[in-house]
């Protein structure tokens, strides 16, 4: 069911199966998300399956998510197949050609299944979306292709869970209903004994067993639904206040999660000048539509506020599309972003001495390197190692002496190249990079916070270097513990063994 927590349940099951000694991999034939990742082979895939692969303790592969749709507008998306963009399409265009992608999905799944003991397949939305059931290869259509038994995940937190379970099952075809071997009720608060009568009644009415009731779990694992939860929970302003500008088509917001782990730091997502307030650092994140979101910054008054902050000494940091916005201008010779097909030039914010030109081929690559000679408040970053990945269609020109980092591709022994930029005159407080994950390296986020504290004449003696990877492993184990405690794993293994 849509927004029921399928991604986290899948990650939890992957972790349990891995702990039990099985080779397990996640799979989602089609994902729609702005958060994406670049594999070791340079292929682009959805981050939800990256999280699930991490839970399974394996390297992410584009086989786990052969089709990714990245929205570029309210009615169109960039279509990525097997890690490469094949074009931008309106919804009608995509559904008209969707049937041609079924062989790609089948091939990806079969290849993955041949390498692993168990493949955990996540559906998308609800299996009862009868209006788009034709040519389905994501939900029950995918289950048929894989000959896989199905567990239905239902969210009780929003209310009406029993009607939702019953209605979903009744809208399935008879042969599809027979494939559903169990129901998981997710996000429960309170005493499960109160549910017992309802559980028995729904089992009697549908003939499908309830295999467990998962509680509302406080676990810090990135999830497709977690951004709305982060934003709706208004962060109190702490000793260090970091404001991420929530542009309309923001992507890869997970770049900043590491700051939430540091004591005394508030990470806020803001959409207006009023919400922006007086932060210590402003981050402009990546976006699927750089020029469109830059225009939004202008129309909303946010650009003027950011410029005022930068001129008064507040740190401004741009990542990917946010980095492009900080420059002098953005040229789109093919009119790709605005959909006109006509060449256009958009003035940038003018905070960095860079100019960006969009090209047709997207750069997708994992990379490693180090910070160069960093000027100003973040000088302590100089020489620190960094790693991450790039996903962008722009080529950015800048004076090499103003470079922020030096990087090279991890897997093809490419040449070391200057990357990113910084202002080297005036306040020395504006920085930009294409590298997603730039803050995740050991000690980088802590150095940034220490510098922001020093600017205020303060220090935090008990700050510890954060091992982000180890922290995430701990969270996956907490999730697995909850799965074991609240689901009937014996029954789930029996379902796996019996198949369909």
Predicted features, each with a name:
Residues 320:
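Catalytic nucleophile serine of serine hydrolases
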Residues 325:
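Conserved catalytic-site region of short-chain dehydrogenase/reductase
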Residues 1-315, 332, 360-362, 372-500:
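Flexible phosphate-sensing "switch/lid" loops adjacent to ATP/NTP-binding sites
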Residues 223-226, 329-345, 354-368:
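Conserved phosphate-handling catalytic cores of large alpha/beta enzymes
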